[in-house]
Amino acid sequence: MENNAFKSGFVTLIGRPNVGKSTLMNCIIGQKIAITSNKPQTTRNRIQTVYTSEEGQIVFLDTPGIHKAKNKLGDYMVTVAEKTLSEVDVILWLVEPSNFIGAGERHIIEQLKKGKTPVILVINKIDTVKKEQLLEYIDTYRKEYDFSEIVPVSALKAENIKELLKCIMKYLPYGPAFYDEDTVTDQPVRQIVAELIREKTLRLLSDEIPHGVAVSIESMKYKKNI
């Protein structure tokens, strides 16, 4: 029987490079899909991950960070991220309380003001600051933009993630699931493996190679009990 109360929709994560977008996505779905690194612009492609519950299905689009591009690769990645803003039902803007609003944040605000999509401000890494500092940070952002919701979380420690998911569901339309309940990403296994290799390369050889490294897998063998 069809569930008329079921919700489904697309949600994009935006923010400065390295604020924890990929970490948040991995936390929500409970497994590692998007790679993380301390290098800017680790995420190059638009990755879809899927969260499904009894209430609905959320398809997350983890885009490259929005910033002012310094080269052709950066320009392409920013274009992909900004184009996504008009294609989704909800925008999650991920920030961290270590810095207040600067040129990068104002650039994102300019992009958000061009549309009418609900925007949820997600303040990540709340485990790294005191409550007084967090409240001051929230107040600063409230003065800059009329957010639909403001949700503090810690993606690393999985704090307040359930509350964030409830907030997202509020703004999704009613409709059927886009994927079956066992699907967690649209990425093929080969692509996920290639990204995991790239992550390790960026971490272990950060001084030897630029962050413009790419991985090409020629063959794969599946083994049990690894």
Please state what every model-predicted region is.
Residues 1-90, 95:
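Conserved G1/Walker A P-loop phosphate-binding module
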Residues 15, 29, 33, 48, ...:
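Signal for well-folded cores of large energy- and translation-related assemblies
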Residues 15-16, 62, 123, 217-221:
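Flexible glycine-/small-residue-rich
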Residues 40-42, 64-67, 97-101, 126-129, ...:
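Conserved nucleotide-binding/hydrolysis micro-motifs of P-loop NTPases
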Residues 41-44, 74, 78, 85, ...:
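Amphipathic alpha-helical transducer elements in NTP-driven molecular machines
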Residues 51-57, 76-150, 221-225:
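Conserved C-terminal guanine-recognition region of P-loop GTPase G domains, centered on the G4
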Residues 117-118, 127-189:
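Canonical P-loop GTPase G-domain recognition
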Residues 189-226:
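P-loop NTP-binding site
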